[in-house]
């Protein structure tokens, strides 16, 4: 069993005079993590699947690595946030000149009129392609159902016709029976007398000399036999219906969206909203602790503001943030999902207390999703996410307030108001729903969709990365040019590719990105193994370059660090 100890090293390293911590084993071997900031130090914490280094976090966290302690600390912090606090005062962005000027930027109706004919023409073309795919899909399904009917008919005969005939015959015998011996409910009624044709019927005729009473008993016996046969035929009919339903459920490719469907209406509204470049998109992703879903570990935010993208540019400008909650810092997922909280690809991750995380998020929401000026009110606003309703519920549990009509948190999941949005309407744009309404449920995870449309990605299940990829995926879903080049409207072709990937997933091993912590650990082992071997080659560590984690005492300080220094 290895015993570990913390060693404080105050040695100078060039111009970096910051204190750093080093975790060593008894044999002196172990990775060294130096602070790259001017903060007073960094705490390296040994975790189940790697060492986590946080620049600027110097307080003693002894014992907090225990799961129960971290969970308790998070839940206690969440309980304290349930007390009333003034969310409206989270508005530091309105104190920064750059963001003040953005609020004075109005949506251009002239540009909107120029874009509209192009969007209308594309949607008309999209309708035709979806209808064609829908027609082909339905024709294939009907052919398969007809084949099931034919095979069933060869074995069982025409069950439906047999059942209809038998039910009609039973109905006739029931009328005869009720006429001979009227039931109590019909004794007061005047029933039609039996005719010669009734008595000579081919189902259960009355022989000459047979009394009505005996004939009644014969009819009852005949009806009893019919009841058994009818039940048998009904069972066979139900089995046929079940088999056809099974064919419908398992049929591939099943296209649901066509030009008159609710699915297509949702797709069209999303595309029109985004292609008009009217919508300010606030994308969210939450990562929770796998053994206690009440505990949030990471929050990722990516924002696309069309006001920052009005000047023609080849690259869309987005604002990206990755927040790690201090109380749950040491909680690492590993059993069900990979933990990549220290693998943020878009810069530094900010370690904040739960309270300051809430202030950070609320400040962004209050700026981007709550209009203040008249120019502000000319823009639409939307939450974006992959199954975003779950992320919104998580944020509600920690006290984040969402805008809507009357600022009461009424969010529009249906896009019914997308064509005539009000000042306070906030739409819900969901990449999972968009995909499913287009291509069905198979392959609807974020990673599989990104892979399907050849969108580069890595280190999913880092909340910051997921938010960024989700936002860009939705923008590509609604980008007319990307849809044309990628063939997104050839629904059957896309669904065929989904099937191919599904078959490959069964045959091939799952590819999982290697955490840089593991890379460093392997490098240390290699150095130990090669000890004493001289080499002119400089030692290398194979890893992805990340921005690392930095601790901030307040949300405002964390946000201020993102602003340009000039």
UniProtKB/Swiss-Prot annotation:
GO terms for molecular function: nucleic acid binding. Residues 1-41 are annotated as: Disordered. Residues 1-16 have a biased composition (Polar residues). It holds the Pfam family DEDDh_C. It comes from the Eukaryota. High-copy suppressor of DBP5 mutation. PANTHER family: GOOD FOR FULL DBP5 ACTIVITY PROTEIN 2. This is Good for full DBP5 activity protein 2. It comes from Saccharomyces cerevisiae (strain ATCC 204508 / S288c) (Baker's yeast). The gene is GFD2.
